[in-house]
Regions:
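Hydrophobic ligand-binding cavity/cleft-lining segments
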Residues: 1-53
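Short, solvent-exposed secondary-structure boundary motifs
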Residues: 1-3, 30-36, 63-70, 90-95
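Short, surface-exposed coil-to-beta transition loops
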Residues: 6-8, 69-75, 96-101
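Beta-strand elements of well-folded, non-transmembrane domains
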Residues: 13-15, 61-65, 78-82, 94-96, ...
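Short amphipathic alpha-helical segments
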Residues: 16-22, 132, 136, 140
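Hydrophobic pocket/interface hotspot
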Residues: 20-24, 30, 78, 113-115, ...
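Glycine-rich portal/gate segments that line the openings of hydrophobic small-molecule binding cavities
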Residues: 42-91, 143-154
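Beta-strand/loop substructures that line and gate deep hydrophobic ligand-binding cavities in soluble
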Residues: 89-138
Length: 154
């Protein structure tokens, strides 16, 4: 049985694609809208020869599993070429990787944001990780849409 699960999460965010993309690229902003993230710290940056900005973060999540509140810290890398889709990579223990591609497409006066997540996880955790990631990112995009709709403190 495959250790890989894929999910696609789509939302419409009021705002121009460049503004939505720029806001999303600063992972410290996501702490305001992601239901699990409690801390974000940028730990490195690099610029690839093709102009892709690569930014590394340490992210701390808090979640409840089987009635237990757990807190864990993991690495996230965001790779953003000057234009187009961005790539994300989250590495969590034990042997969990979330590989993402995020696109920002103009839709009238708004932006359609689409995230394709490929989740690699050991069998006992696969369903939990996929469900939690999909729910958390759906809620994150809904909170982003609400924030952009009000224009509050972007």
């Amino acid at each position: 049985m495959s250790r890989i699960v894929s999910r696609v999460i789509t939302a419409t965010i009021p705002g121009r694609p460049a503004a939505v993309r720029a806001w999303y690229l600063d992972l410290t902003n996501l702490r305001r809208v992601h239901p699990l993230i409690v801390a974000v710290r940028q730990v490195g940056t690099a610029l690839a020869a093709d102009g892709t900005a690569i930014t590394d973060y340490l992210v701390t999540d808090r979640m409840v599993v089987a009635g237990l509140r757990i807190r864990f810290t993991y690495r996230v890398q965001i790779s953003a070429p000057p234009e187009g889709p961005i790539a994300t990579l989250a590495r969590q223990a034990p042997r969990i990787r979330l590989v993402g591609q995020v696109t920002f497409t103009p839709t009238g006066d708004a932006t359609t944001i689409q995230e394709t997540l490929t989740i690699h996880a050991p069998w006992p955790l696969r369903r939990l990780v996929a469900t939690e990631a999909e729910q958390a990112h759906s809620r994150m995009f809904a909170a982003m849409a609400a924030l952009f709709a009000t224009g509050a403190d972007l």
